Curated annotation (Swiss-Prot):
Subcellular location: Nucleus
Metal-binding as UniProt keyword: yes
Keyword match Cytoplasm: no
Name the record gives this protein: Depudecin biosynthesis cluster-specific transcription activator DEP6
Function: Transcription factor that positively regulates the expression of the gene cluster that mediates the biosynthesis of depudecin, a highly oxidized eleven-carbon linear polyketide that acts as a histone deacetylase (HDAC) inhibitor and makes a small contribution to pathogenesis.
InterPro entries membership: TF_fung (IPR050815), Transcription_factor_dom_fun (IPR007219), Zn2-C6_fun-type_DNA-bd_sf (IPR036864), Zn2Cys6_DnaBD (IPR001138)
Primary localisation category: nucleus
One of the record's GO cellular component terms: nucleus
GO MF terms held by the record: DNA binding; DNA-binding transcription factor activity, RNA polymerase II-specific; zinc ion binding
Organism listed in the record: Fusarium langsethiae
Gene label: DEP6
Keywords: DNA-binding, Metal-binding, Nucleus, Transcription, Transcription regulation, Zinc
Taxonomic lineage of the native organism: Eukaryota, Fungi, Dikarya, Ascomycota, Pezizomycotina
Region (Disordered): 76-125
Length: 611
């Protein structure tokens, strides 16, 4: 963040100090000396800037620098064989605008989307998640070969530098911040509300697609606490990722919560809009680093989902009698699109609660997934004319023939696998540790095979869900191997017994850094930052990859191999710093990695990351 000097200063802004700029490391720009120079007892000098450049000038310079970097990479890096990855087709039209303003609408395509990448079926061209030049050799990167890219000689300094101005333009990070608890509807214009709804559905929606835009557009012209809660929570989701509207986040948050609480006070619980509003609110609180508040909000949503019997919504008719004594239920319907929306909403809740568990260890409140009798999400864009495929229960995967699996359904399968890995590492498994470990490694490989169509370089650059799916699958792989390494130490096994586990964990960490490199944000497409869109879902993979690299740094090796680990770690730290302030939860979890990088930098002259 470029900070302002006091009023008596001769200039208003400063770059990094001269030493940090020469060494190409991050500088905290503190006065009179930055933290790095103070620690190393070096002279810290800042060059004066006579006039702050405008944002347009900064972005223009970044465009030129990145274009030069891409051109240099194209010349220096030999292209591999032509990739066999097929590009996924995408529709160019969008669903109707969701707003309380009836006059605002958009065209609706007649045919239903059949693309399994359901969340990228529509998107306006100005929000595509693209690197500066689409012909980059990065598109040929191997994301599956074990050990691929394990000795990276690529200079990533231009990419790391490109993230710095984005940190100024994108204030939303995974860090606690106080939000004023006041908000009035009079402070929100209908035009602003409509613009945020449009922005959400055209950009943010594809990162977590569980709301039917057509239904929302129709019902948002009505009134009532449930639809009002959803209206303001959707605006909150759009506002969070939209820099111009970010100053009104607290107003939308307060209004969304107030209407959600009114639903409870008025007893209007059997409404899908209320449940979806709780999900939006809980996701926002998680992004703000308010884990306890998010857990409580999602806990309310979980209890509501159970009262509405969503976990058993697809069980056979003869067994649909309530066993919990709840008199609540959603309205009966045969509308396939509405039924699919209910399923996606439930699975969104399952994914969000599982994210909190990976951070806190708290148990999910939806019950045992083995008892769920609800179909997995179907491929296809969620809208009124969707005819969903008949999908199996999650317990039937591997035993029943399964239609094409969307990346959203893939996330559900990945979360189930990750939770089983967590339980196994904590000793909750039914089998002995090593049998369970081998079974989980096999399950991970099988899931990669099942979802491979979503896990290529093209898909993870276009589909935010596929991006987080890939990173979390790799992080789950690392977690399994790290738990095996830890258990072998406890049992006094020779290091040779875990050599393969360490090799695979390191390879997975390199593949995570490769995927992150593919999705470094374009400075001129700030609102299309796929890393920030998926912030709460990719922080854990970034941390797991850094921990795997730490083990490699401790082990040592040749200068080239260590330098590959260091440069990969620098990129991951830059991405983590992009989505979370230093000192945040995930930064604290990898503080030992940062210390190790600084130690290497000071002793050996590596360009390690200084935060």
């Amino acid at each position: 963040m470029i900070r302002q000097f006091s009023a008596g200063s001769s200039f208003t802004a400063r770059h990094a100090c001269e030493i940090c700029r020469q060494r190409k490391v991050r500088c905290d720009r503190a006065l009179p000396r930055c933290r790095r120079c103070e620690r190393l007892n070096q002279a810290c000098v800042y060059s004066p800037i006579s006039q702050r450049r405008t944002r347009d000038e900064q972005l223009q310079e970044l465009q030129e620098r990145l274009a030069k970097t891409e051109a240099q990479l194209a010349l220096d890096a030999p292209r591999g064989p032509a990739s066999s990855m097929s590009s996924q087709s995408r529709s160019d039209s969008a669903a109707p605008a969701a707003s309380r303003v009836p006059s605002v609408s958009a065209s609706v395509p007649n045919s239903a989307a059949t693309n399994p990448m359901d969340m990228v079926g529509t998107r306006s061209s100005n929000t595509s998640m693209d690197l500066p030049v689409n012909t980059s050799p990065m598109l040929d990167i191997d994301l599956f070969t074990a050990g691929a890219d394990s000795n990276m000689a690529l200079d990533w300094n231009p990419y790391l530098t490109a993230l710095e101005p984005l940190d100024n333009l994108l204030p939303n990070r995974l860090s606690p911040r106080s939000l004023p608890q006041n908000g009035r509807e009079e402070d929100i214009s209908l035009a602003e509300l409509n613009a945020l709804h449009n922005y959400y559905f055209e950009s943010v929606y594809f990162s977590f697609p569980f709301l039917n835009r057509d239904r929302f557009a129709g019902e948002s012209t009505g009134n009532g606490p449930a639809i009002n809660a959803l209206i303001y929570s959707v605006a909150l989701a759009g506002c969070t990722h939209s820099s111009p509207q970010h100053t009104k986040v607290s107003i939308y948050y307060t209004l969304a919560r107030n209407y959600a609480e009114k639903c409870e006070r008025d007893g209007q619980l059997n409404d899908l809009n209320f449940l979806q509003a709780l999900l939006f609110i809980g996701r926002f609180e998680a992004m703000e680093g308010k884990v306890e508040s998010s857990w409580m909000t999602l806990g309310r949503a979980a209890m509501l989902a159970r009262l509405l019997r969503l976990p058993q919504m697809d069980r056979l008719e003869e067994s649909t009698e309530s066993q919990d004594g709840s008199g609540l239920s959603l309205l009966e319907t045969t509308d396939p699109a509405l039924l699919e929306e209910r399923r996606r909403t439930f699975w969104a809740l399952y994914i969000l609660q599982s994210y909190i568990k990976t951070r806190t260890g708290w148990q999910c409140m939806l019950g045992d997934i083995k008892t769920f009798q609800i179909n997995l999400p179907s491929p296809g864009l969620l809208r009124s004319d969707l005819t969903p495929l008949k999908m199996p229960f999650i317990s039937e995967i591997g035993t029943e023939p399964c239609p094409e699996v969307s990346s959203y359904a893939g996330c559900v399968l990945m979360v189930d696998l990750a939770l089983r890995c967590l339980d196994h590492a904590q000793g909750h498994g039914a089998t002995n540790f090593w049998d369970g470990y081998c079974a989980l490694v096999k399950n991970t490989d099988e899931l990669f095979g099942m979802l491979k169509q979503h896990l290529n370089a093209t898909s993870i650059r276009k589909d935010p869900v596929a991006f987080s799916l890939y990173l979390n699958l790799r992080a789950t792989e690392i977690f399994s191997h790290e738990s095996a390494i830890a258990r072998s130490k406890e049992q006094g096994l020779p290091p040779l017994m875990t050599a393969e586990s360490q090799r695979r964990a390191t390879a997975a960490a390199f593949q995570i850094s490769t995927a992150v490199r593919l999705n470094l944000p374009s400075p001129w497409k700030v609102d299309s930052d796929i890393i920030m869109l998926q912030a709460i879902f990719i922080a854990w993979p970034l941390a797991m990859a850094l921990k795997a690299f730490y083990r490699e740094l401790e082990h040592g090796g040749s200068r080239d191999s260590v330098n590959g680990v260091v440069t990969s770690s620098r990129l991951l730290f830059a991405a983590l710093g992009h989505i979370e302030e230093s000192g945040g939860h995930w930064h604290q979890s990898v503080a030992h990695v940062e210390a190790k990088l600084q130690e290497l930098d000071e002793k050996n002259g590596f360009n390690s990351l200084a935060l």
